[in-house]
Curated annotation (Swiss-Prot):
GO terms for biological process: 'de novo' AMP biosynthetic process; IMP metabolic process. It comes from the Bacteria. Plays an important role in the de novo pathway of purine nucleotide biosynthesis. Catalyzes the first committed step in the biosynthesis of AMP from IMP. Keywords: Cytoplasm, GTP-binding, Ligase, Magnesium, Metal-binding, Nucleotide-binding, Purine biosynthesis. NCBIfam families: PRK01117.1, purA. GO terms for cellular component: cytoplasm. The active site is at 13 (proton acceptor), 41 (proton donor). One of its GO terms (molecular function) is adenylosuccinate synthase activity. It is an enzyme of class 6 (ligase). Substrate binds at residues 300-306. It comes from Clostridium botulinum (strain Langeland / NCTC 10281 / Type F). The gene is purA. This is Adenylosuccinate synthetase.
Length: 428
């Protein structure tokens, strides 16, 4: 393969960072194609733990080109904080190792302010935003009033755009929401400083990435969030503001669909989600608490406790269909060791009918009753398993059920957070 995608097959937090890090060993280029610093990836290398939000996971290798695509919304302050954090851990970051699309949109201070104000105004109908300005930045992109990286690094263009945009945003902040106006000079001077620091990293990434593919280089596209958080196919409105599925790669990195050869869906061996929204297999009992504690299910970006539930194969089948997944990588199967009985959802009962897809209507999904198939658990810790044959028989049966139901093979299994706790079962 020369170009493949790694994306979340559930509600995010599936272990994409670890899987990208694992697969990046054989890649030449790693590309982030959507989202912003609302994403959180944890990668463990040896005894060191790295927490990434914006920068692609390939940065932990010395010989990879890392790309932030045009589909990403870029917070310069967050970017340079992350660069400083990584450099403090000994990771070198230079324009030879990291490039940023000139077409990426920039998150501005008013985006963060509006994100918080609007969320508070929703009251008990809040959607669980991270408050980092992601949604408002994508809104400006679609309204054609956003500021792109290429605008930011051209002083005159930035000055004019900021004046026009800030005038409108301040009216909304003060007159609609009763907030305090933002100071033009303060923002202008702060972002001019970012512009100079960004300039060496800024490129037309579509040209570079397509040339790498044409030259036969291995290109890995790294997704953020997950399929059920996609702006179109997720549990709307409890979704993110970008396209998290395979189709998002084409618009978020400037490559054609025929360039993509494989798509790997990352899925936990159980299901989690953060924030509000329907969750058919949610466990609201001691088993859910046990899984949360054993799996350390707390958000990298927000610190929020994740809701936990049984594995939902309807969701995985939907993800495989929407993104044309060629295989799954299953993570955290080690977390389930110790449970006597495991359940997997193989369908929903909705208004007396059995369905095997995720309905678009939030109201319908909330009514869905999960139909379960039970499996015997396993007592053995499998953290030391290094090949498929090391896994308990019941764990293998569990993985086989995923393959049979979704009609998609499981190519990778993870039994812990470290690189060497990963086994490749088949080619992806």
């Amino acid at each position: 393969m020369s170009a493949f995608i790694v994306l979340g097959a559930q509600w995010g937090d599936e272990g994409k960072g670890k899987m990208t890090d694992y697969l990046a060993e054989n890649a030449d280029v790693v590309v982030r194609f959507q989202g912003g610093n609302n994403a959180g990836h944890t990668v463990v290398v040896g005894e060191k733990e790295y927490k990434l939000h914006l920068i692609p996971s390939g940065i932990l290798y010395n010989d990879k080109l890392n790309v932030i695509g045009n589909g990403v919304v870029l917070d310069p302050k967050a970017l340079f904080e992350e660069i400083n954090y990584l450099e403090s851990l000994g990771v070198e970051i230079t324009p030879d190792r990291l490039i940023i699309s000139d077409r990426a949109h920039v998150i501005m201070p008013y985006h963060r302010v509006l994100d918080g104000i609007k969320e508070r105004a929703r009251g008990n109908k809040d959607i669980g935003t991270t408050g980092k300005g992601i949604g408002p930045s994508y809104t400006d992109k679609m309204e054609r009033s956003g500021i792109r990286v290429c605008d930011l690094i051209h002083k005159e263009v930035f000055e004019e755009n900021l004046k026009e945009t800030l005038e409108v945003k301040n009216k909304i902040i003060t007159e609609v929401f009763g907030g305090e106006a933002l100071d033009y000079n303060e923002i202008y001077n702060e972002y001019l400083g970012y512009a100079e620091k960004l300039r060496p990293f800024v490129k037309d990434i579509s040209v570079i990435v397509n040339k790498k593919i044409k030259d036969g280089k291995e290109v890995l596209f790294e997704g953020a969030q997950g399929t059920l958080l996609d702006i179109d196919y997720g549990t709307y409105p409890y979704v993110t503001s970008s396209s998290t599925i395979a189709g998002g790669v084409c618009i978020g990195a400037g490559v054609g669909p025929t360039a993509i050869t494989n798509a790997v869906g990352i899925a936990k061996a159980y299901t989690t989600r953060v924030g509000k929204g329907p969750f058919p297999t949610e466990l609201l009992d001691s088993t859910g608490d046990w899984v949360r504690e054993k799996g350390h299910e707390f958000g990298v970006t927000t610190g929020r406790a994740r809701r936990c539930g049984w594995l939902d194969l309807v969701i995985l089948k939907t993800s495989a269909r929407i993104s044309g997944l060629t295989s799954f990588a299953v993570t955290k199967i080690d977390t389930l060791a110790g449970l006597d009985t495991l359940k997997v959802c193989t369908g929903y009962r909705l208004n007396g009918e059995i369905i095997d897809y995720v309905p678009a209507s939030l109201e319908d999904l909330a009514k869905c009753e999960p139909i379960y198939e039970e499996f015997e658990g396993w007592d053995d810790s499998i953290a030391n398993a290094r090949c498929y044959e090391d896994l308990p028989e019941n764990a293998i049966k569990y993985l086989k059920k995923i393959e049979d139901f979704t009609e998609t093979k499981v190519s990778i299994v993870s039994v812990g957070p470290k690189r060497d706790q990963t086994m490749m079962i088949s080619e992806i």
